[in-house]
Amino acid sequence: MNDIAHNLAQVRDKISAAATRCGRSPEEITLLAVSKTKPASAIAEAIDAGQRQFGENYVQEGVDKIRHFQELGVTGLEWHFIGPLQSNKSRLVAEHFDWCHTIDRLRIATRLNDQRPAELPPLNVLIQINISDENSKSGIQLAELDELAAAVAELPRLRLRGLMAIPAPESEYVRQFEVARQMAVAFAGLKTRYPHIDTLSLGMSDDMEAAIAAGSTMVRIGTAIFGARDYSKK
């Protein structure tokens, strides 16, 4: 077993243990392998170990990887864009990715809707919440959620699937859980209006257990799978 396969197995075991501790089924939680700055060869190792969902933060880098595996004839992969999205890059996301986690304004959602090719299924989207109210983070306030969700839900080439957040780092589990619960409550409220939504993208390596206990359905794990990132190669 190579390092990436070993790391994936360890992460899956942690997800399973965290789910079991709070009475949830591990199958309720999707592992999104964050492969930003990592070479296609590392992703190939993860694919060989059974991983199919990958997250990318940089548009062109992600598109290059998507094309690489398409040219190799690899099927069944699911590509998630999880970085801040500029208007001038929206077409590439609309044309190549399966998911976009970072919807935080109607203008971007409308562009993605208009640019999604007719031959592809609707683009799965999550609305990003700035749950810790950090100036450095993208996302909307919870008070803005209802209005944006209603507008996004009307766009036919997008499929609203739920919410995403990147909470501020917290060292204490209790505080991690409190913040994650705020997101879970917002997600539950949204689900009463849009019963089809099913995805709360919340939790990374340091707060995964608290996020799962609060109700996360998708955790985003990078370094614990692929090792430290080299941002000089992005």
UniProtKB/Swiss-Prot annotation:
Role summary = Pyridoxal 5'-phosphate (PLP)-binding protein, which is involved in PLP homeostasis. May have a carrier function to deliver PLP to the target enzymes or a protective function so that PLP does not inactivate essential lysines in proteins. Does not have amino acid racemase activity.
Whom does it interact with, and what assembly results? Monomer.
For the modification N6-(pyridoxal phosphate)lysine, the affected residues are 36
Query: How is loss of this gene reflected in the phenotype of the organism?
Result: During the stationary phase, the deletion mutant exhibits a completely different intracellular pool of amino acids and produces a significant amount of L-valine in the culture medium. The log-phase mutant displays slightly decreased coenzyme A levels, accumulates 2-ketobutyrate, 2-aminobutyrate, and, to a lesser extent, L-valine. Also exhibits an increase in the levels of isoleucine and valine metabolic enzymes. The mutant also accumulates gamma-L-glutamyl-L-2-aminobutyryl-glycine (ophthalmic acid).
Which GO terms of the molecular function aspect are on file? pyridoxal phosphate binding
HAMAP family the UniProt entry points to:
PLP_homeostasis
SUPFAM superfamilies for this protein: PLP-binding barrel
Q: Could you tell me the keywords of this UniProt record? A: Pyridoxal phosphate
Q: Which InterPro entries match?
A: Ala_racemase_N, PLP-binding_barrel, PyrdxlP_homeostasis
Q: Mind telling me what this protein is named?
A: Pyridoxal phosphate homeostasis protein
User: Which organism's genome codes for this protein?
Assistant: Escherichia coli (strain K12)
A Pfam family recorded for this sequence: Ala_racemase_N
Which PANTHER family does the entry link to? Answer: PROLINE SYNTHETASE CO-TRANSCRIBED BACTERIAL HOMOLOG PROTEIN (PTHR10146), PYRIDOXAL PHOSPHATE HOMEOSTASIS PROTEIN (PTHR10146:SF14)
Q: Which family does it belong to?
A: Belongs to the pyridoxal phosphate-binding protein YggS/PROSC family.
Taken from the UniProt entry, a GO cellular component term is: cytosol
